[in-house]
């Protein structure tokens, strides 16, 4: 440990161990995932806190070798063992980009692409970005750089291949290989009744494919092939949303599928159920009629749905009549 601390000091980083970690120091080969809580503080006597992952409610996940925009974090993380708590005072040369990187940390902490919301900014918005970061403390730090203190608590270190990466952190090849596995995991979770978790898996698989699809010419064979992989995942996602009673999201997604594939029976059926749930009786009946037209074998299932819809409508009519009688009797 003494030689590690000495090497850090030579590079302008002062490490102070607050709590020793467990076991041996991991080798931190490329692809290793480090999960840790961090707190960023000013290096002055007041030690004002700039950021705190615990406030965000989720620890940071850093994958070694992915060229994170704040290289010093890879440097210091690779000196820590699981369970270790340490503080690192870093010279200005290591943290001059911190104000810019800080804007991405919120996205990373929740498993999103760190550039989300930045790629499609118009020119005026980008010019504003360069002049202001939207946070007074970060603006001040950008204009007047100073050393920073990082308080780190290493929670977990996972070797390559022992964990599932967030979609934004994968290469294109990794995304393509991961989709069937994520799909299977979503199916397993749904069968076991973990609907919310299953929806999250389907969402991740869709995100992988959408990212790959963005790199293809719309309408090209490659684009269509990816879209045909997205469709069953999106239908599974819609099934989760039906169970969760998030009907308007189901309506949106099923309509988007039917705009491209107007013979998709499952999309008509799920949209019909969603319409029925929000009292769009005519739309529900039209969708169920389309299901029968495309697949007459589903007649028993459709009849059951239509009977349930009619029963709900009758019950609602009776409740409305009773309510109106109560109003006019006063």
Swiss-Prot record:
Phosphoserine found at: 43
Location relative to the cell: Cytoplasm
Any GO MF annotation of the entry: peptidyl-prolyl cis-trans isomerase activity
InterPro entries noted in UniProt: AIP/AIPL1/TTC9, PPIase_AIP, PPIase_dom_sf, PPIase_FKBP_dom, TPR-like_helical_dom_sf, TPR_rpt
Family matches, as Pfam families: PPIase_AIP (PF23322)
Keyword annotations of the record: Cytoplasm, Phosphoprotein, Repeat, TPR repeat
Gene3D superfamilies xrefs: 3.10.50.40, Tetratricopeptide repeat domain
Tagged with keyword Repeat: yes
PROSITE patterns, per the entry: FKBP_PPIASE, TPR, TPR_REGION
UniProt GO cellular component terms: cytoplasm
Signal sequence extent: none
Domain PPIase FKBP-type: residue ranges: 54-146
Segments annotated as TPR repeats: 179-212, 231-264, 265-298
PANTHER family, per the entry: AH RECEPTOR-INTERACTING PROTEIN (PTHR11242:SF3), ARYL HYDROCARBON RECEPTOR INTERACTING PROTEIN RELATED (PTHR11242)
Assembly mode: Interacts with RET in the pituitary gland; this interaction prevents the formation of the AIP-survivin complex.
Described function: May play a positive role in AHR-mediated (aromatic hydrocarbon receptor) signaling, possibly by influencing its receptivity for ligand and/or its nuclear targeting. Cellular negative regulator of the hepatitis B virus (HBV) X protein.
Name by which UniProt lists this protein: AH receptor-interacting protein
Source organism of this protein record: Chlorocebus aethiops
Gene: AIP
């Amino acid at each position: 440990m003494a030689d590690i601390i000495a090497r850090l000091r030579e590079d302008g980083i002062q490490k102070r161990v607050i709590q020793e970690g467990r076991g041996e120091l991991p080798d931190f080969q490329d692809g290793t995932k480090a999960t840790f809580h961090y707190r960023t503080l000013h290096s002055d006597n007041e030690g004002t806190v700039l950021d705190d992952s615990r406030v965000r409610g989720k620890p940071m996940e850093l994958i070694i070798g992915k060229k994170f925009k704040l290289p010093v974090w890879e440097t210091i993380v690779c000196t820590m063992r699981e369970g270790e708590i340490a503080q690192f005072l870093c010279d200005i040369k290591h943290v001059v980009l911190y104000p810019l990187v800080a804007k991405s940390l919120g996205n990373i902490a929740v498993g999103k692409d760190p550039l989300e919301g930045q790629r499609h900014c118009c020119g005026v918005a980008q010019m504003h970005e360069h002049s202001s970061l939207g946070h007074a403390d970060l603006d001040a730090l950008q204009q007047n750089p100073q050393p920073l203190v990082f308080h780190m608590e290493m929670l977990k270190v996972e070797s390559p291949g022992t964990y599932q990466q967030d979609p934004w952190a994968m290469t294109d090849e990794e995304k393509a290989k991961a989709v069937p596995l994520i799909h299977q995991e979503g199916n397993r979770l749904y069968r076991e009744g973990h609907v919310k978790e299953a929806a999250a898996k389907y969402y991740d698989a869709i995100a992988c494919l959408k990212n790959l699809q963005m790199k293809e010419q719309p309408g090209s064979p490659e684009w269509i092939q990816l879209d045909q992989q997205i469709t069953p995942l999106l239908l599974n996602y819609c099934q989760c949303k039906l169970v969760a009673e998030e009907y308007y999201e189901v309506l949106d997604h099923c309509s988007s599928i039917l705009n491209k594939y107007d013979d998709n029976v499952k999309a008509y059926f799920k949209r019909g159920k969603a319409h029925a749930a929000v009292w769009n009786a005519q739309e529900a009946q039209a969708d169920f009629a389309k299901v029968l037209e495309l697949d007459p074998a589903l007649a028993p299932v459709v009849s059951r749905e239509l009977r349930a819809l009619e029963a709900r409508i009758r019950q609602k009519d009776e409740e409305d009549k009773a309510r109106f009688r109560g109003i006019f009797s006063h």
